[in-house]
Amino acid sequence: MPGFSRRPLAVFVCCLFAGVQTGHAAADIERAMVQGESTAPAAERSVAMQLAAVSELPLNLRKERKFDVLGKKKQPAEPVAPMLAPEKPIELKKDDAYPLFIVADQIEGQADELTEAEGDVELRKVGTLIYADRLTYRPLEDEVEATGSVRMLQDGAEISGPHMRMKLADQIGSAEQVTYHIVKEVPSRFYAPQQTVVTVASSNATNSGAPMMLNVSNSYGLPTQLPPPRPSEANGYAERVEFEGENQMTLFSNTYSTCKPGQADWYMKSSETHLDYDRSEGTARNATLWFGGVPIVYTPVAGFPLSTQRRSGILHPHFSASTRSGLDISVPYYLNLAPNYDLTLVPRYMSKRGMQLGADARYVDYFYEGEARFEYLPNDEMLGRSRYGYRFEHRHNLGQGVSAALNWNGVSDDLYWQDLSSRLLQTSQAQLPRQVSLGYSPSPWLQSNLQVLRYQTLQIDPNNPVTRPYFLEPQLNLVGYKPNIWKTDFSMVGQFSRFTHVDAGKVQGDRMVFYPQLSLPIVHPAFQITPKIGLHMTKYTLDQQAAGLPESISRVLPTFSLDSTVILEREGDWFGRGYIQTLEPRLYYVNIPYKDQSQIPLFDSGLSDFNFAQIFSENRYSGYDRINDANQLTAALTTRLLDGETGVERLKAMVGQRYYFKPQRVAITGETTRQNDFSNLVAAVNGLVAPKTYADVAWEYNYRENISERFSAGVRFQPELGKVMSASYRYTRDPLTTLSTVDQVDIAGQWPISANWYAVGRYNYSLRDKRVLESIAGVEYNAGCWAVRLVGQHLGAISGAANDTVFFQLELNDFGSIGSNPIGLLRRSIPGYGKINELPTSSSLLTSQ
């Protein structure tokens, strides 16, 4: 059969149809082929461009042949009515015929047997694009052999070399003397939402807590949203490549790096590397890691990730040094046992204390989830005894409205967290809960819960002993809320509690509470009025009561409240944007008669903090052991700035005060009864005070004595991820001693100091104690495909010597890291901290507020 090159008319028509060498059409078709899109629309759009170019430029006639790969004959298209968009996407099945095009200066061969192309050859198929000097295609085997300057683009990979052979449909073949460049999109694991367990400075805080504004809603315009997936690159050279199917290849005598081509600051050199993109993992044999032209690590077998997906294997070792533990080395081993459960084993060596073993197991299912963590040090060489810590959490949906939960924590001794810097809890809490609960919700308006709750109390500071709380063994709660009952809302609380204590001499006993309430909401677009009545009933059955005190006590108190709010609005302008300002005066009246409660023990009640949440509550005490007598009115004023386009709140300011119409009679131990007819003034402001600047201020002012009882102020400026500065001040005064219990300044930030260099730090100082609670200082360098971090931490101890730690980490992007990882520390200590080698590059990610 004659060769196709002898049919000039067909060749000319094919050239017009292909049109891949003219203008922007060539780039459009190449992008479409690499991304797996159909090239037909692009080719059709380019015809007019090509015809216009013919009159101005000499037309270089080239040959093109089209194949139906699976041998199916192309059916003539039926006329179809024009549509704006298809009702659903067209799906290509595995046995459908994928069209294949070959374009070259010369094409010869036999139909359906052999085609040979030479001279600037281009093969196009959905998802695949091959360039070569010479190419042979066998349609029956669907096999291509290309020689010369071969370049293949397929599924985000670019493979170049002098020779390649491949079966296109199966993606099986080989190539020699290859340079490769692979680009995949991966999501950021660092910026993904996660729960952060933190502490704040309490009334007797002498240690460093979490900084203010650690978690700020992205509605305020700060760049806190999750960035889109970022490109992950891999490139290198291989003497030979075996293509082993879709997303599978093996490189021989190769290099591997995630740096850009020609800028390999680091690379791995190995005798064999297998890349499995289905499992998102790579495996190298006889591998040597080179950095800056110097070999730094050799391993006979190395596994590394190809994405952020989980995989089994040795995680990157962590190294650090501290004054309490000495040289600290841990080598975690991760077991991806199943998609819904995993296990991490963490052997840890501390030069001053010995060998510790840790384990972390996680699991999740449709109806339950949980996590178990355990650490064991068989022999602490500094103390001469074993030490351990554990934490177990489980939540279970048993169906039919039944749920269960377990939260069990424990350590071997009081100073376990302080000495071993454990990662079990990112907090220095002194009360470790041990709780088992069972919940039941028979209907949407009724919930019940049964729990047993105990605590392990840690006495960390001998100068400030921690009071041991009562245990609940057990407690039964019943909560109900039924709206719209003849235009009224019904709510009720029922509770039975059995209080026990480790100190057998303390009073113990049972408490029963039943508190039904009925309210009548009157709602209008401009105002709301809600009167509410209730009857608070409590009964105690006590053990170990002091002589002369009753063992059975009952208390019945009626309650009445009236809550009213008016909402006024106006439009305006703020920082060049339209906004809506609201003005919301609110009055809240409460009346509860007096009843002597001095014979009732204090199981779980205490004086609540005086703030905006508390001044709009009926009872100033927590728990149910004390119900205050009240004839009082709270007056407050709130103003908000709402975005004129979205309605999102940008700024809120509040001020309020409570007025008393009779003297206080109910009090708890240590409380000074009120002598005035009005409370302290409380005020708060939070929100966007300037572009990219968030502020949070709270103030309790005693204007009778002209002093501040409580004050906190913080500001966070963050124009973009990787640039953030924050500063805060916290002060709390003890009303009994008139001395400050908290008086701290806290400054933290991350900021670029030169090209690719970032400074990080935190300074938390106690003005009351005149000592540094925590200081962090360090630098980070982002080289594009690798980053290095050097961070020092000074952590003041509640008792004993302070702990100083140095972190050094070399991170190779999308490959691994060497050294001690300070990321967790920086994230907990610096509000808005951004990982410098995962920062988004598009300014469109940042909001304009």
Curated annotation (Swiss-Prot):
One of its GO terms (biological process) is Gram-negative-bacterium-type cell outer membrane assembly. Keywords: Cell outer membrane, Membrane, Signal. One of its GO terms (cellular component) is cell outer membrane. InterPro entries: LipoPS_assembly_LptD, LptD, LptD_C. Residues 1-25 form the signal peptide. It is found in: Cell outer membrane. Its main location: membrane. It comes from the Bacteria. Component of the lipopolysaccharide transport and assembly complex. Interacts with LptE and LptA. Belongs to the LptD family. Together with LptE, is involved in the assembly of lipopolysaccharide (LPS) at the surface of the outer membrane. This is LPS-assembly protein LptD.
